[in-house]
Amino acid sequence: MLNSAMSVVILAAGKGTRMYSDIPKVLHTLAGKPMVQHVIDAATKLGAAQVHLVYGHGGELLKQTLKDDKLNWVLQAEQLGTGHAMQQAAPFFSDDEDILMLYGDVPLISVETLQRLRDAKPQGGIGLLTVKLDDPSGYGRITRENGKVTGIVEHKDATDEQRQIQEINTGILIANGADLKRWLSKLTNNNAQGEYYITDIIALAYQEGREIAAVHPARISETDGVNNRLQLSRLERIYQAEQAEKLLLSGVMLRDPARFDLRGTLHCGMDVEIDANVIIEGYVTLGHRVKIGAGCIIKNSVIGDDCEISPYSVVEDAHLEAACTIGPFARLRPGAELLAGAHVGNFVEMKKARLGKGSKAGHLTYLGDAEIGDNVNIGAGTITCNYDGANKFKTVIGDDVFVGSDTQLVAPVTVGKGATIAAGTTVTRNVADNELVLSRVPQVHKQGWQRPVKKK
């Protein structure tokens, strides 16, 4: 039965000794964000009224990293078991709400599975997430009588007969707040580990005649926890394979699904093609018929229809209108904007710069703090000199300007419409419309010149 309100407790107090890291285990990233953030996001999508995060090791770093004012931080000063962790959060439970218990190191749990668990919770009983494993060694076993769940026995406390049981406890459960507080108050640490097990509440509920409803996840990987980097890397590949499958089934062509990483959210139009070893980070939108070459990194950007990004280009916090082409080996830094049909070639870097419609910067160029008009040609080796060592200044180039190779534009400077800047020119003053500007050292010819001879 579904109650009107639900809060979530996320256990995240463990140090993660087997990670061999100074960083708290739950802050190690999967798909570009901390494991615990995946769990927080699932709780939020599920409609949690409150999320209680039980922390211990590395608490300050956790707070600095997550920066979530909506979290209720609950300190577990000593790690004395899952039951003890829940006891620390219990004072915050309302009697008339359901409490869902999750883990910060189980990052792949899905909203769909949690919703089924929530729906399955009996009135006054417990909803329990379980799985069946071919090798259940090390896990708490689900005990049943006549098909009904009666309790959970931890592996170290289990008899030989109980260790043959393949159904195991995932640790994820949901119960009413008032019931949970009552059961938590009855926990003891009379076991092989000397800890307070949350799993003991199953037997307490059964003794009261309460029903325990067991639910299985859609995929076993949803309940896989992380104790070391090997396990984390395996979950990363599982997650990425799932994302690649979703994209392929939605019409996106991934040339090699095993070599694609999604570390954020990707929205795609029709007939998008993505080559191998592409990384998508943050929030990215790809329009219709976009092509992304091998080895590219796209982060927090919008790519318009019919754009083509050639191999090994990096696009971050940029906006490309329709039919733009960039790369190979191009870099668009935050604030880069390409209007329709613009071209940025190999070894061109843009930052806080706008390249107008049909304009081109073919190669070996830096455009920073610049506003460039339509139909402009930027020659090879052009540099906008935007920084004087203390402050940044802007370069403005009008429509239909031709900038020759090896040009330096010393900002602040404005180049008028239709102007031509000869190759090798250093522009330090504004240029009027349709002017030709050149600044070169006179060329000297010396006939019969001989090179110096090396001294022996």
Swiss-Prot record:
GO biological process, one term: lipid A biosynthetic process
Catalysed reaction, written as an equation: alpha-D-glucosamine 1-phosphate + acetyl-CoA = N-acetyl-alpha-D-glucosamine 1-phosphate + CoA + H(+); N-acetyl-alpha-D-glucosamine 1-phosphate + UTP + H(+) = UDP-N-acetyl-alpha-D-glucosamine + diphosphate
Binding site for UDP-N-acetyl-alpha-D-glucosamine: 11-14, 25, 76, 81-82, 103-105, 140, 154, 169, 227, 333, 351, 366, 377
Span list, region Linker: 230-250
Chain segments carrying region Pyrophosphorylase: 1-229
Cofactor binding description: Binds 1 Mg(2+) ion per subunit.
Gene3D superfamilies documented for this protein: Hexapeptide repeat proteins, Spore Coat Polysaccharide Biosynthesis Protein SpsA, Chain A
UniProt entry keywords in alphabetical sequence: Acyltransferase, Cell shape, Cell wall biogenesis/degradation, Cytoplasm, Magnesium, Metal-binding, Multifunctional enzyme, Nucleotidyltransferase, Peptidoglycan synthesis, Repeat, Transferase
Molecular function via GO: glucosamine-1-phosphate N-acetyltransferase activity; magnesium ion binding; UDP-N-acetylglucosamine diphosphorylase activity
GO cellular component: cytoplasm; membrane
Location(s) in or outside the cell: Cytoplasm
Active-site residue numbers: H363 (proton acceptor)
Superkingdom per UniProt: Bacteria
Enzyme superclass (EC): transferase
Chain positions recorded as acetyl-CoA binding sites: A380, N386, Y387, S405, A423, R440
Residues annotated for Mg(2+) binding in this entry: D105, N227
Enzyme Commission no: 2.7.7.23, 2.3.1.157
Cofactor(s) listed: Mg(2+)
Location of the region described as N-acetyltransferase in the Swiss-Prot/TrEMBL record: 251-456
Family assignment from sequence similarity: In the N-terminal section; belongs to the N-acetylglucosamine-1-phosphate uridyltransferase family. In the C-terminal section; belongs to the transferase hexapeptide repeat family.
NCBIfam families associated with the record: glmU (TIGR01173), PRK09451.1 (NF006986)
Subunit comment: Homotrimer.
Function: Catalyzes the last two sequential reactions in the de novo biosynthetic pathway for UDP-N-acetylglucosamine (UDP-GlcNAc). The C-terminal domain catalyzes the transfer of acetyl group from acetyl coenzyme A to glucosamine-1-phosphate (GlcN-1-P) to produce N-acetylglucosamine-1-phosphate (GlcNAc-1-P), which is converted into UDP-GlcNAc by the transfer of uridine 5-monophosphate (from uridine 5-triphosphate), a reaction catalyzed by the N-terminal domain.
Protein's recorded name: Bifunctional protein GlmU
